[in-house]
């Protein structure tokens, strides 16, 4: 008996919405996330720097800027997850348990995929540095922005929480659950899969300096999407993959680019 049949017999859905009806309320998460990612950093960063300057009568330390910026991302991402939880409060615990039953049996496969993807990223990086000057890049623009959150030891824990745990979950909800699972009820499945990968990629490379910066994010988005689809739209499987990969990337950045 497969997991979905077992879930139905127990009255527990394998997904948050197994019906063919699109839950339109879910899509408020997209503008809410964009809004929170824009407003919360302004409030937290300028608020903390302003209060510090007012109390000390001195310019705030540089680490405080990076800490408050990273903290603002955690707050924004956390708020989105709280909103999503409240929207599905009556069913989400059972769904997570059922999806975890499937996901824990695929851990080895997920780890292997994450390692293969990381090796592909290394190969792409080598190719990127060997291209002609107008096409080459060492770090993508997104990676350069991310490095700012590693400039102080005070920031690392908050950055780790955001980069490894919270952001990947928000991304699974938006790119996999909303776009593929929900929109897939009314639009062509192959189209929404391609749309999901395209949007996830563009969000990371909107300010790219080289067209080849797009390659790493296509690989990551494609791998997460394939795992999601192959596991019958299991968010936990895709999430675990992203957590493992982001943890590897976090350690790499920590070892290469930090010098406290």
Report the location of each language-model feature.
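Membrane-associated alpha-helix detector
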Residues: 33, 138-139, 144, 175-184
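Transmembrane helix-loop-helix hairpins at the membrane interface
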Residues: 153-260
């Amino acid at each position: 008996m497969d997991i979905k049949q077992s879930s139905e017999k127990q009255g527990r859905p394998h997904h948050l919405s197994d019906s063919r009806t699109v839950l339109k309320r879910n899509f408020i998460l997209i503008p809410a996330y964009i809004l929170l990612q824009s407003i919360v950093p302004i409030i937290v960063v300028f608020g903390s720097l302003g209060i510090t300057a007012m109390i000390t009568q001195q310019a705030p330390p540089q680490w405080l800027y990076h800490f408050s910026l990273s903290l603002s991302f955690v707050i924004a991402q956390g708020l989105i997850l709280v909103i999503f939880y409240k929207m599905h409060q009556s069913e989400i615990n059972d769904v997570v348990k059922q999806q975890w039953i499937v996901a824990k049996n695929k851990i080895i496969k997920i780890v292997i995929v994450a390692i293969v993807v990381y090796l592909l990223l290394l190969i792409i990086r080598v190719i990127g540095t060997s291209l002609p000057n107008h096409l080459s890049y060492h770090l993508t623009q997104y990676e350069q922005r991310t490095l700012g959150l590693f400039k102080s030891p005070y920031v690392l824990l908050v950055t780790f929480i955001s980069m490894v745990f919270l952001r990947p979950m928000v991304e699974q909800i938006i790119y996999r659950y909303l776009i593929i699972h929900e929109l897939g009820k009314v639009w062509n499945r192959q189209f929404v899969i391609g749309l999901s990968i395209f949007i996830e990629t563009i969000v990371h490379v909107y300010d790219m300096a080289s067209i080849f910066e797009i390659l790493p994010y296509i690989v990551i988005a494609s791998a997460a999407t394939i795992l999601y689809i192959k596991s019958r739209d299991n968010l936990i499987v895709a999430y675990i993959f992203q957590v493992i990969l982001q943890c590897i990337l976090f350690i790499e950045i920590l070892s290469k680019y930090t010098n406290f």
